[in-house]
């Protein structure tokens, strides 16, 4: 461990001369050597050497500037003190932060008054109805109305306003606002247990309508009776007509004596209180306390003050009521509930003040932190970057290389692109830090040619310099190329642009990865093995003889079974029957004859006679004949010759015909077959560069850029001479230096990849990168093994307003199963290889690996993830992708492509003239901004219905095709989910995924008592009877819920997500976003009632254009509960709100399938494809329904 030495300032241990150096050093020491505080600029290493710290702030860009040095020291010390203050301030904030999130729950459980109250104040009915009976004034109602009078069939009501016109009077409290606005008073429903309902009817023994008629007759006879007006007030209270209650009570007050006014006042106060004019009600009750029934008045006044939040007055009123009637349970319970609420609010106010104080401290801390960062920028402005300091140290120690024992030193120079070191004297050279010397292979002493070999050391700092003064290149150099295929780098002195290409050269020469047809083919000559063929001359045959081409079939050969399996399939390949001459092979053939004027017929005759009269091993001549037929373009004869050469060749030389046969296959576009032969050739002999170059070309054609790059690296390692390889050197070096130009920087394989690496020193090639998100998961019935095809999920890369983001999830579960199979990412299967090959072929090469360019939109490919469900051994038995269906395929592969849309940079790509039609189509499709248009096969939509369907003309599959297809299990429940991100809402702004959870698990609960309205769809049977739903739950949405914050935070457990949603929902019950998230939680948990409670709350508060998010969830719940009519209504509403979302159409189609309304389902699945053409589940369901309609006469589900 290095020990730090405190030295203020900075100086370099470099040899200098002259008095100027001594003067500057003494002046510097006199300035900086003061005080005890010190920076740790110098350190002592483990071997006792004093050297600078690489990241010291005293390493300046201008080390000669003394003023900047002194300012830098002041800034360093200031930053240290400021950092201490920030740390202390942060600790103070964290220690004093109020983290008590369970204050209310703990208070309700521990406070004595809360325990005595048993329920919170909010759960008590503070509008409890009260009244003062006439009997308490010794008045009998029977004395004022004729109870024996008959009542007509149409009884009258006691309308006080028609009996007497009352003038304005302050005694009737007409100055109060509630009385003035009596026409508009609200009338909440009275609870059935309100005692006012039984007062009159129980007393008079008649129905309430009959009593009203009798009161009306009494008022007709005596319009000034305060008793009759009070009876009329009781009547209208029972009828819940506040306006009439106030009118009758005002007249009762007008005619009542002072001692009897309390009856009318309590009636008036109850009506005003229930109409939310509680302050006016308090004034009225206070007037009744002058001479009144103290118990009723005080109890009523206690309820009013509790509602107004006047807790002290409320408690005092309840105490007075208890004095008048000790032991009254309702008053006792309300008194303790008020005290409980009062203390809770006091605690919450204290917590709020604490949090506000913490917030102010955090703002101050943020201000100080910003100041700290600005000072840090000032410090970094003059500081030398770490990489530059490392380079300076390397250069310094290189120049000051010392003799190992004597301490003598000499200055050496790096030459030849830093692959050799030139020293003045022939002395031993020692290097303390030789990071720069990975590519240095020898040292030259003096001016003669004496050299000394050098062993390479570990290369910690990747550098690639043309000379010492150049800055470090950013492009990594994988291996030294001092010796390129047996040639010294001096041989490339005039070809430096090939060996060390610049980025501009690579962009001009290879703007993209070459296509398969643009890559050269090679011929592996036997001369590389030391084998030679006798040169063919005209003496070998008579020119007068008829020219005959070489016939490899006439040769007797022994059958070798070792490699026959590699080429036996090639003999019957139809795609090899075409005649395609190979220009590369023709040039190689002519160069081997060394006479470019000889016609091909004569060359064929040479080879014909050589085969019949061999003067060399026959397999060598057959190898040459294979080259001839490659040049001519006859693949059948070429394969025959090379196959016989392969069988006759010794085992150690079998790589020669294998490589040449593989290049024939590459020329015919059979790149995957070629890779098999080339990998076998590598196993035979791994020292031939041409073998690896051929393998790299095959990988490039298969769009496996990472595999190709690895093959090219292996080729560069070899020292075997290979003049034919130099034509590909520039491409190889461009891909090495600038892999980002060809999207070769990631580990994602874009085509056919192999698990086995070319070199054991490298990690196994990964077929796909770490998955970023999973928007589609599947469960299939265990007995069917049917697999839905990839689900395409679309989302925008930014938060731009014009880049609408659609993130829909489609999940399929089988009835009675709720387990999601885990992905098996450790094995690569042929299914994946076939899938990506199809994917790559469907989309243009410009989009490989990083971006996709489709119809004017630029897309970024994020990753591929596989959820695999197969046999017990975990390996699929056969390949299947797209619409292929095999009856014995027991594996289910669900692949999700997640594509992000980003703004296309201006001037990034020039549109070719042939793309005008596509551009116009893209413009026409912009009315549905969320629709990502991707080219691909589209399912033909049926034409207009006719009496007799002609299925073939509709583009439907034929009955024979239907018998071959594997149908989708339409009875399986498909769950869909429309994320809030489709509305440009970032869920992380609503839910805190970052703060660790330090409290017990909670579950998000929504208000189940929201008022009934059409907005909450309570007219639907499934919503109104949600408590009795037969809902099985949707556990397959678990991963969707756990990945809500996947872009920024890791996956969390279901309990953690539920707790986070519950915390924020508890504070904000009016957020439709949080209510929708809570509904998703309850869908996973299988609690249909709680899920619908949350969806009602979301629908209650959501704007109209956002309602399709909760509507889609509600439609899925109703679908699951087999309430299909309700589900159709809800899903249709979602489509009407957002017709541009494919998931809305798909959901409605699923409901119609469950109802066996297959024609309607077809319509909605086809509209799904119009919005999202590559949505494979919709395609598969269309095919299944079409086949069902043709092959099934009954109306049962297929």
Swiss-Prot record:
Coiled-coil region(s): 340-382
Show the GO cellular component annotation of the record: actin cytoskeleton; cytosol; plasma membrane
Coiled coil listed as a keyword: yes
Q: Which stretches are TPR repeats? A: 295-328, 619-652, 689-722, 1071-1105, 1108-1141, 1142-1175
Q: What is its main location?
A: cytoplasm
Q: Does the keyword Oxidoreductase apply?
A: no
Specify where the region named Disordered lies, as residue ranges: 774-793, 902-954
Q: Where is the composition biased (Basic residues)?
A: 902-914
Localization, per the record, is:
Cytoplasm; Cell membrane; Cytoplasm, Cytoskeleton
Q: What's in the keyword line of the UniProt record?
A: Cell membrane, Cilium biogenesis/degradation, Coiled coil, Cytoplasm, Cytoskeleton, Membrane, Repeat, TPR repeat
Source organism, top-level taxon: Eukaryota
- GO annotation terms (biological process): actin filament polymerization; cilium organization
Question: Mind telling me which Pfam families this protein's record contains?
Answer: TPR_8 (PF13181)
- Report the function annotation for this chain: Plays a role in primary ciliogenesis by modulating actin polymerization.
- Give the PANTHER family listed for this entry: TETRATRICOPEPTIDE REPEAT PROTEIN 17 (PTHR16091:SF1), TTC17 PROTEIN (PTHR16091)
Q: Which family does it belong to?
A: Belongs to the TTC17 family.
> What is known about its subunit structure?
Interacts with CATIP.
Q: Write the protein's name.
A: Tetratricopeptide repeat protein 17
């Amino acid at each position: 461990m290095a020990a730090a030495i405190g030295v203020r300032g900075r100086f370099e241990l470099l040899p200098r001369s002259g008095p100027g150096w001594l003067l500057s050093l003494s002046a510097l020491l006199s300035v900086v050597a003061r005080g005890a505080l010190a920076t740790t600029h110098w350190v002592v290493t483990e071997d006792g050497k004093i050297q600078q710290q690489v990241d010291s702030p005293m390493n300046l860009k201008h080390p000669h500037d003394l003023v900047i040095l002194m300012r830098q020291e002041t800034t360093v010390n200031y930053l240290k003190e400021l950092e201490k203050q920030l740390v202390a301030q942060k600790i103070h904030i964290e220690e004093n932060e109020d983290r008590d999130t369970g204050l209310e729950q703990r208070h309700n459980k521990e406070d004595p008054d809360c325990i005595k109250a048993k329920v919170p104040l909010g759960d008590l009915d503070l509008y409890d109805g009260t009244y003062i009976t006439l009997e308490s004034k010794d008045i009998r109602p029977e004395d004022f109305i004729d109870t024996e009078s008959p009542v007509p069939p149409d009884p009258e009501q006691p309308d006080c306003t028609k009996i007497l016109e009352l003038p304005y009077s302050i005694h009737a409290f007409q100055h109060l606002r509630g009385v003035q606005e009596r026409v508009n008073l609200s009338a909440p429903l009275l609870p059935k247990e309100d005692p006012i309902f039984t007062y009159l009817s129980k007393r008079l023994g008649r129905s309430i309508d009959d009593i009203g008629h009798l009161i009306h007759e009494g008022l007709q006879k005596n319009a000034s009776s305060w008793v009759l007006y009070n009876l009329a007030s009781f009547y209208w209270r029972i009828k819940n007509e506040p306006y009439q209650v106030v009118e009758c009570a005002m007249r009762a007050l007008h005619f009542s004596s002072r001692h009897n006014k309390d009856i009318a006042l309590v009636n008036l106060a109850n009506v005003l209180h229930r109409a939310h004019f509680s302050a006016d009600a308090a004034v009225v009750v206070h007037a009744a306390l002058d001479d009144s029934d103290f118990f009723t008045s005080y109890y009523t006044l206690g309820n009013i003050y509790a509602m107004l939040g006047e807790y002290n007055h409320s408690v005092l009123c309840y105490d007075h009521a208890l004095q008048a009637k000790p032991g009254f349970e309702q008053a006792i319970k309300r008194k303790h509930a008020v005290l409980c609420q009062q203390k809770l609010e006091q605690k919450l106010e204290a917590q709020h003040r604490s949090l506000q104080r913490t917030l102010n401290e955090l703002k101050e801390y943020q201000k100080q932190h910003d100041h700290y960062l600005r000072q840090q920028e000032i410090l970094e402005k003059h500081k030398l970057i770490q990489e530059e300091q490392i380079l300076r140290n390397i250069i310094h120690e290189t120049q000051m290389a010392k003799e190992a024992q004597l301490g003598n030193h000499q200055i050496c120079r790096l030459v030849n692109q830093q692959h050799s070191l030139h020293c003045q004297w022939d002395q031993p050279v020692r290097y303390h830090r030789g990071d720069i010397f990975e590519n240095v292979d020898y040292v030259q002493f003096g001016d003669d040619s004496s050299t000394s070999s050098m062993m390479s050391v570990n290369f910690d700092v990747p550098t690639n310099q043309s000379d010492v003064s150049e800055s470090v290149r950013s492009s990594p150099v994988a291996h030294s190329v001092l010796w390129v295929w047996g040639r010294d780098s001096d041989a490339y002195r005039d070809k430096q642009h090939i060996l060390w290409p610049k980025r501009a050269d690579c962009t001009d020469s290879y703007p993209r990865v070459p296509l398969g047809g643009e890559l050269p083919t090679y011929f592996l000559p036997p001369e590389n093995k030391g084998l030679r063929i006798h040169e063919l001359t005209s003496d070998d045959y008579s020119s007068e003889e008829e020219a005959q081409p070489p016939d490899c079939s006439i040769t007797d050969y022994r059958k070798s079974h070792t490699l026959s399996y590699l080429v036996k399939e090639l003999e019957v390949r139809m795609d090899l029957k075409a005649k395609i001459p190979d220009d590369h092979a023709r040039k190689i053939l002519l160069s081997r004859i060394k006479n470019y004027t000889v016609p091909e017929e004569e060359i064929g005759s040479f080879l014909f006679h050589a085969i019949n009269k061999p003067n060399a091993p026959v397999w060598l001549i057959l190898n040459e004949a294979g080259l001839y037929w490659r040049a001519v373009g006859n693949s059948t004869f070429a394969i025959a010759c090379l196959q016989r050469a392969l069988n006759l060749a010794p085992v150690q030389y079998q790589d020669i015909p294998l490589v040449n046969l593989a290049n024939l296959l590459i020329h015919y576009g059979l790149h995957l077959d070629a890779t098999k032969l080339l990998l076998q050739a590598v196993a035979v002999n791994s020292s031939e560069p041409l073998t690896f170059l051929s393998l790299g070309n095959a990988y490039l054609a298969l769009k496996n850029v990472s595999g190709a790059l690895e093959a090219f690296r292996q080729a560069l390692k070899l020292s075997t001479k290979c003049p034919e390889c130099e034509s590909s050197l520039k491409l190889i070096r461009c891909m090495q230096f600038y892999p980002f130009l060809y999207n070769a920087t990631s580990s994602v394989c874009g085509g056919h990849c192999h698990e086995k690496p070319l070199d054991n020193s490298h990690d196994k090639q990964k077929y796909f990168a770490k998955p970023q998100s999973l928007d589609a998961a599947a469960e299939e019935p265990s007995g069917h093994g049917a697999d839905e095809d990839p689900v395409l999920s679309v989302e925008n890369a930014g938060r731009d307003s014009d880049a609408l983001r659609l993130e829909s999830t489609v999940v399929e579960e089988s009835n009675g199963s709720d387990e999601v199979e885990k992905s098996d990412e450790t094995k690569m299967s042929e299914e994946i290889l076939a899938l990506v090959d199809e994917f790559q072929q469907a989309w243009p090469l410009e989009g490989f690996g990083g971006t996709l360019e489709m119809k004017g939109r630029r897309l970024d490919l994020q990753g591929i993830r596989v959820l695999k469900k197969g046999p017990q051994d975990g390996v699929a038995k056969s390949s299947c992708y797209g619409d292929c269906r095999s009856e014995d395929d027991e594996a289910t592969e669900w692949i999700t492509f997640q594509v992000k849309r980003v703004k296309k940079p201006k001037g990034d790509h020039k549109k070719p003239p042939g793309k005008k039609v596509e551009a116009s189509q893209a413009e026409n499709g912009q009315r549905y901004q969320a629709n990502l248009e991707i080219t691909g096969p589209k399912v033909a939509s049926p034409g207009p219905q006719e009496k007799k369907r002609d299925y073939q003309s509709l583009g439907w599959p034929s009955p024979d095709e239907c018998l071959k297809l594997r149908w989708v299990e339409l009875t399986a429940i498909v769950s869909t989910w429309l994320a809030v991100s489709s509305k440009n809402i970032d869920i992380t702004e609503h839910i805190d995924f970052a703060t660790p959870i330090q409290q017990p698990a909670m579950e998000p609960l929504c208000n189940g008592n929201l008022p009934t309205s059409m907005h909450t769809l309570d007219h639907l049977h499934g919503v109104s009877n949600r408590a009795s739903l037969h809902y099985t739950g949707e556990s397959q949405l678990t991963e969707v819920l756990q990945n809500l914050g996947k872009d920024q935070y890791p996956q969390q457990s279901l309990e953690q997500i539920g707790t986070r949603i519950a915390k924020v929902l508890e504070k904000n019950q009016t957020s439709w976003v949080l209510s929708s998230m809570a509904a998703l939680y309850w869908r996973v948990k299988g609690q249909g009632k709680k899920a619908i409670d949350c969806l009602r709350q979301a629908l209650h508060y959501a704007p109209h254009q956002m309602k399709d998010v909760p509507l889609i969830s509600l439609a899925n719940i109703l679908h699951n509960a087999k309430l299909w009519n309700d589900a159709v209504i809800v899903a249709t509403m979602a489509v009407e709100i957002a017709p541009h979302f494919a998931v809305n159409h798909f959901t409605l189609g699923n409901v119609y399938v469950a109802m066996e309304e297959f024609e309607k389902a077809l319509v909605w699945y086809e509209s799904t494809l119009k919005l999202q053409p590559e949505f494979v589940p919709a395609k598969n369901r269309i095919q299944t329904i079409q086949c069902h309609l043709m092959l099934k006469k009954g109306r049962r589900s297929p």
